[in-house]
Amino acid sequence: MILRDPVHGLVSFEEGEESIVPKLMDTPEVQRLRRIRQLGVTSYAFPGAEHTRFAHAVGSAQVMKLLILRLRAIHGELPFWQQLTSDRASDALAAACLHDLGHGPLSHLFEDAIPGVPHHEEWTLRIVLDPGTAVHKALLSVDAGMPERVAALVRGEHPLPYLAKAVSGTFDVDRCEYLLRDAHATGVRYGHYDLEWLLRSLRFAKVEDPSRAPALAIDGAKGLPAIEAFLLARLFMFQQVYLHTATRSAEWMIRATLARAASLIMDGERLAGTPRAIELAAHGEPIPLGEYLELDDAALTVAMHAWESARDPVLCDLARRVRQRELFKTYELFGEQASPAGRERALAVAREVAKKHGLDPDVYVGLDVASDVPVAAEADPLLVVFAKGPPRPLTEVSFLLARLAGQVLSRVRITMVPKLREEVVRALEASGAAD
């Protein structure tokens, strides 16, 4: 199979160990990812962000292929049991292709909106391990043990730590791929870094215990700027894209819409166009895998369009605002006002303004808190190797990353219907909550 890709150029998956990727791509479960946008409603802020989870899955498999080539170029010094054999490579390619298989509509939004809905990681494992799925059968056609091995890799578990971390770790194929693709689609420059040189800089860190497989490390003489650029790119993408005000506002509104619909369904209301999976989730009932796989962006869009004609005026209003991109406005809190106590005071002020206007404060005003740790302080950190001396943790070698390690990037915003914003800001200033 040969494909043209705007991020990676010519992408190919040949016979042998790579043949599992085209097999998986042809399954209904992977094809479903064509109907789920990678960045949800980020296109409300960045019009080009219409790329799909499917494109990311193919790209992740391509990055894994490049990583496998590099690992094989340097694994000759390892004992055979620690080397990347053909069956292990096939498992890794499959895991890279399938790692996001369980995502629901608009990526993370669905699982966050309705309490009790399993997260996408759990759905991914269910799809891989369920004997009735085409994905499971495709894996089974290669090897009877392949579904279990691929599921373990998706969980970040493998006898070879370097392979587990390639699927789920600080420097994994998922992050390597989505940064480049998201930057390309949104038109920003922050997510670009030198993937080719970063892969070229990979080494194995020697371990004293010969029974343990070595960890993957960065060549300190060549790769330090490349890994710094990679981690800083992730930081900048969170600052400028993933936590963008318009995106977060749209996400908040959709969560509010889904929560309102779930509440009405729980109270016995029948909402036209609602997928069966949403009805079950609203009642707190388990969602069968088949019903979950019917969910995609189109199903949710159709449902929300139908909800514009519902009897509940609040649901109608929210659904209409989302479709028309009439986004809620935000007011960002800083310093003491962003602390847990400060944000609650600010929210209370905003709620009082909403009540004064006869609006439901549980719907038309809210607190949006988004956070991430771009450079995690890990117990098992990424290592850097030099010609002399033992491997050292990356954050000990890079003064830039040492300053960032463990730091939480957070945005705390009051979200509200547009007509309330000026009055809310005045009320916050008058109360001292916006000082």
Can you name each region flagged by the protein language model?
Residues 1-93, 101, 105-435:
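Histidine-centered, transition-metal-coordinating active-site segments
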Residues 98:
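Aromatic-lined, polymer-binding surfaces characteristic
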